[in-house]
Amino acid sequence: MNLLRNIKSFKLIIVIFCGTVVGVPEEITNPPTYDYYQDKGDSFNYIGAKTYKGDFIQTTSGKVLSQRAEGILYWEDIPFALPPLGNLRWKAPVAFVAEDFHINPKENNFCHQEIGGQIQEINQAGSEDCLYLDIRAPHGSRDNLPVMFWIHGGGNTSGHKDFYNFSELVKRKDVIVVSPNYRLGPLGFFTHPAIQDYHSGIDKTSNFGILDLVLALKWVNENIASFGGDPNNITIFGESAGGHNVLSLLVAKQAKGLFHKAISQSGYTKSSSLQNAYKSEN
């Protein structure tokens, strides 16, 4: 929910790429209460909470309230996957489908991560219930706007969807920006015999965070037209580890056809020495 700052400019390295539901939670029957923020230029100040029955947009995840700040519309904390807890931990994400669900803003919904890069209990923050996304769009009624799908950085061990406020990008370039969370650290990228030897199919992967992004992209393809976006013009973009994940999505068969262009900002690839490659085979 916290919007930290406007991003002012991008240095882009552009890669052009031309390019697959279960679970219904308990329905919420009481009117939802929403937190409201006042636009103060480069930040948003909390101004209280109220119950509001206004403009809602229907999605496969439920009904989400349209909120307005100066020059933009925004929708926050939309669940695109069931919480990856219990039997869903270290497995491919499962889509959240509940059309009668009223989506409430959810505080502190960034994915579980280390603070300061040290594995100590006192430095842990976040929640495993974190697979949510935000949408920013220009104010006014328009259709078929280009969609930009943001992937945050942080070494795939830290970061969250709320770090950048894309209001200026949305207003200046007339685009829609979608920013999801994805699982991080050992909950998102983890290789262990208990996973590889006893799971089957896509659950055998070690890249659960990448699969979260794939599912978020599927959600965008199915729902973004309701927000004025063009599902046939989706650009994925990310910085640092987010740029690395962009490159991963370019070669992931599960992501084929889900986006049309890609921007990797300070992205990177990794390679192993021949000696280590032989070790992994043995």
Q: Which role does the model predict for each range below?
A:
Residues I202-A225:
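Alpha/beta-hydrolase active-site loop
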Residues F227-E239:
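Alpha/beta-hydrolase fold nucleophile elbow
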Residues I7-G23:
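Cleavable N-terminal signal peptides of Sec/SRP-targeted secreted and luminal proteins
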Residues I47, D100-E121, Q196-T205, L215, ...:
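Mature extracellular catalytic domain of secreted serine hydrolases
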Residues M1-I7:
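Positively charged n-region of N-terminal signal peptides that target proteins for export
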Residues N2, G23-I210, P231:
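Non-catalytic accessory segments of hydrolases
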